[in-house]
């Protein structure tokens, strides 16, 4: 197939249209516009950078003039139309796309990342039991850890934090709400504040590849 040459202004217009930055209200207004925007973009990266406002709020506000922070909270924690997981970074993802991330979740069952090399299975079981017994929690709710020295600047002295993170990447728990960067973790079941999904859907390789091919050009 012969490459198609386009001018820089044309390429710019194509990109702006794909990103829905060339129309005033591409996703409508009100709380429902937030999951619609995330659905079109495929995901919205969650960023700790905070000069004027956090990056994910900027991304939504530039496409939804009436956007408010509580709209994202509503989508994640009340209506459960989006969930958090890792794309190239931590991101908000449409809940209907969760099945396409199951392969990544299962990979953490087969391969132990160097980030979690020191996490023991019994530590993961302990935090899971705690969530099942007491409901959703944040790392601040865990006050009986034996503190350890940090192995890098962003680490926690609580071993339970790394265990919670591994459970998250395995798809055993989800982030049911956020307060800034403080995450509330819960089971996937709706009774404990999760997404409402009782178990992970089955993974299928071919539909996942097809989805990647469809989703990537739409917003990039």
Put a short name on every predicted segment.
Residues 1-220:
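Long, low-complexity intrinsically disordered regions
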